[in-house]
Amino acid sequence: MEPRQELLDPERVREEAKRIVRWLCGLVDRTGKLPAGDYQGKILNTVSEICKRSKLPCGELAEALTKGRLTRSLVDYSELLISNLVVGYFDVLEIYLGKQSVRLSDIREMACKYTFYAINRRLEDYIKFQTAWLQARAMRDVTPEPEAPSWLNEGFGRCFSALLNRKVHLRCVLRARPNDVSLAASLYQVKRVAPPLPDDQIEKNLEKSLDRLTKDEEPAGVDEPFLEDLKRECKRTVDELVQNARREGWNRKISRDCFPSQSAAFENPISKGGQLGQLVKENNTPRLPVLLGMFEYKGRVTPVYGWADDGDTILSDEELGREVPAALKCRRSPVLEPFKVRVITMGPAVQYYRARRVQGCLWDLLKHTRCTHLPNRPVEESDIGFYVRRRGADLFRGEEVPYVSGDYSAATDNLHPDLSLSVVDRVCDHLLSDDNRPLDPVSPWRVLFHRVLVGHRIYDGNSSRNTEVAAQSWGQLMGSPLSFPVLCIVNLAVTRYVLEKACGRIVTLEESGILVNGDDILFRCPERTIPFWTRMVTIAGLSPSPGKNFVSYRYCQLNSELYDMSGSRAEYLPFIKANLIYGTLARGCERKRAADLCYGDTTTEGGTFGHRARALIKGFGPDMQDRLMSRFLHSIKGFLEKIPEVSWFIHPRYGGLGLPLTRPVTHNPYHLRIAAYLSCGGEQSQEARCMMQWLSAPTKSFNAATLLRILEVARNCKVPFRKVPFALLHRAEAAGVDLEALFRKALLRSAPRLGVEYPSNESGDMQRLGDWRRFFRDVGRKAARTRCRSGTADERKGLFLMSPDNAVKGPQYEYIFDWASHNMGGNIWDPSYKFRADPFSSSESDEPRAKEIGPNRGPE
């Protein structure tokens, strides 16, 4: 009788993988040689057996172990990387192939194989190549198979143990059903669990990025006539984008309203306030409150006080100045992602702040054309099922047209500067300055637009000690406020040019069926066109990324999401994002803190545990969702111990974490009472919701004092508090309607000298968690003391507990002040109302008005 297989859990798998790596890498002594004696013979025999089973060259492994290729940093990194990968594959295979499908011998064989490639510094390339090949075969990719790399010592797709290779090959290569495509995509995404690269690899990636940005010559194979065609196509694309946007009411005037970013600047790190901290210097001089204006509402007038008047703020053009240096300084910083380093640049605070005002205008330009509206909202299945499918088929009637899912390598670094400047010049031809003047060739805004994209002086070091390393001569900088919109336009223009050449006629953007989001693109074209598309995007500097481009008749991919196109509509195809299983990783090798993970803005998709858990289980069936949630909760147990004793599953608006519920649970009455309290419309509940909104997203409103001042003005004027459906709020936001108080922007511009409550460090994180605990305890005490105002004495014992279903579902509406109400109820809250550009522009006497006053004069 065979011995019973030992049950494995992720912790046991991780420890076993680490033990194998340490065992192999620990064979050498400090001189880099094998220990002498019989032990050496035993080890060599063991290495020989490992190589035989894994089909690895024994000589290369023994040579790597004996010739001192190992360093302490490499061993430490390899141990962490291999253990993460093995546990990730274990989780995915156990879910798709069934429990106990992975044996302990499989874990050991995989760890040995990965150690061999890690010693030779090829593990990252090996994992990406093998798993990308599996996904391509599962999606029935029609492009020719790539050539085998010289360092690959086994067959394609065989990156697991011998037994698991057979199972995975059967599912992903031979059978290739939708569930098998999901398995292949899940295996490919396991790379997201990789830790940050070691320091020597980071330096190599920084040097590669610098080489790309400082090259002078044209890339080999660039055809000058084609380049001129692409420049004309970029200008034509901008013209059509502007035409579509102006038809929808786009305001081509550069915005005056822009609040400084708190991201790092060249002069100031994020720990010191970033761009905002550089623009608004600390001023400890005692000040009296400054009268910003008088607010009138239904005959009631109340003063609005701030902390600095408009004449004192430095966020004005007069203080910022209009001189643009010939070459802007920028400091580069590595952002660590799985298997790669993304180089982000931090530019000068003044010029980048002004560029952000242009950025808002460009976002509005892109959102009015269907090809480029994805940066403003998430992908919907109708975008692919209707737009891409039908438009692509209409262009090439009578031909079979597959879906082309494109992605590029180092797109911003490699983008041809001539194409970037063509886009910039044409966009500037259509824009108006903040004082309604066209941007002529010597306009400061046009000069600024040019210089925030090209011609930077690149520095290394920190904000106090910088060393110039090179001058930018190619590409764009990832970190420039304007690089992403320009990249979208170039990507769209080049691909549309290819489609026109393929179908032999002029194609409008609406007819093209192209979806673009930065360096991601999805479109349809015949197989005969793929080589020409590859050539054109390469001329533009957009080199297709190996393993991330797919050409399939049934499946497509956009923004790392898969869709099955075999039915009448696009069907979302879920797969496991292994990094989300561990709760602390959404994208890249981030360094999120506990407060950001537990509490965040509930109106937008962010990086909290609730958002990540929903992204993890999205699209799966109930059984799979429950298994994934169990694994998720087990992995984040340490983080949950740091936060107040809040409900895990109650909606964040009612004081919980908002984790998705996949099985029945029993809710604590204490949590249900708090949910009932926060759902009430009383004054204390209003203030509690206001503070909860602030603590969820402290940087979004900048300072809690601004929220409390708005609350004070609303109460003084008795502005009604209304329940507005979320759908209506989203419609208003999409239409560009600001439902906030008219004086909110003036308050924000007055508040920067107050500083931020929570610095971006460990101390600020602990302070924010402490405030959350105090806030939650205070709300709990108030909820316990609250009494009903009607009924008999026995019935007025306190709030009724909210039903568990309603507590989990959350509110269907938002409480906001109705600044625009007419006689306690205006038509702005009617769902059939069509929003105007400014819904508050009515001349009726009972409309709210903000009367501006100067520092030395009274109200007008």
Curated annotation (Swiss-Prot):
One of its GO terms (molecular function) is RNA-directed RNA polymerase activity. It is an enzyme of class 2 (transferase). Residues 839-860 are annotated as: Disordered. Its EC number is 2.7.7.48. The keyword Transcription does not apply. CDD domains: ps-ssRNAv_Botourmiaviridae_RdRp. SUPFAM superfamilies: DNA/RNA polymerases. It comes from the Viruses. InterPro entries: DNA/RNA_pol_sf. Residues 846-860 have a biased composition (Basic and acidic residues). Coiled coil: none annotated. It catalyses: RNA(n) + a ribonucleoside 5'-triphosphate = RNA(n+1) + diphosphate. Keywords: Nucleotide-binding, Nucleotidyltransferase, RNA-directed RNA polymerase, Transferase, Viral RNA replication. Belongs to the ssRNA positive-strand viruses RNA-directed RNA polymerase family. RNA-dependent RNA polymerase which replicates the viral genome. This is RNA-dependent RNA polymerase.
